[in-house]
Amino acid sequence: MEWEDEAYVLSARSHGETGAIVELLTEARGKVAAHVAGAASRRMKPFLQPGARVIVRYRAKVEGQLGSATLEPMGEGPSSLFDDRLALAGLSAAAAVAAAALPEREAHPGAFHALEALIRVLEIPEIWPAVYVRYEAGLLQELGFGLDLSKCAATGAFDDLVYVSPRTGRAVSREAGKPYHDKLLPLPPFMLSSQGGLAEGDVKAGLDITGHFLEQFVFGPLNRPLPPARLWLLDRLAEADKL
């Protein structure tokens, strides 16, 4: 079996003296792992970083078994962010969450395009943390656990939605949620609309929502915690006063 496609690198771990097992996210085939020979070379290391975009030429004797691949870089990749540690933390977290959450060899084009959209804005510090939250919400949607923020779960009202039920992932209005506000998750306005700016605490609230449902529906059933890179991102955003 052979194919060629564009992909984002999600992770790379050493295998043997000079090779690596590389996890890749493609649009048509989803998450795919492959052995890449010569990955330890100085030439290849820069485009084996999380978020690097590459052309993959993949070959396997039997479908479903670990194949081998050659990679060709597309553009400068994450190297453009090397002076921005916070953006690199966001990129590392996005790749780690996708690598841990997505099943192997199952197409999830929405996840591919969500990662693509995030990478495009990582050089804009004012907006990328909010886009990161939407990225995780998009992963939940792709995996069948999408949030329903269209109307109040209790009343059907479309206005003044300020909470999310931690049980169902559905929005709750201010009035309906008032008696239970200490048990509900605050819903930041930017998750309802791309219009308007970010208030203090909005990104933290958004990450709390997506993190809660990733733990509840994706990682919890697998007895896994959120990836360390995701937890590290929260710490780095707090240090930079971006929450």
From Swiss-Prot:
Pfam families: RecO_C, RecO_N. InterPro entries: ARFGAP/RecO, DNA_rep/recomb_RecO_N, NA-bd_OB-fold, RecO, RecO_C. One of its GO terms (biological process) is DNA recombination. Gene3D superfamilies: Nucleic acid-binding proteins, Recombination protein O, C-terminal domain. Keywords: DNA damage, DNA recombination, DNA repair. The keyword DNA repair applies. GO terms for cellular component: bacterial nucleoid. Involved in DNA repair and RecF pathway recombination. Belongs to the RecO family. This is DNA repair protein RecO. The gene is recO.
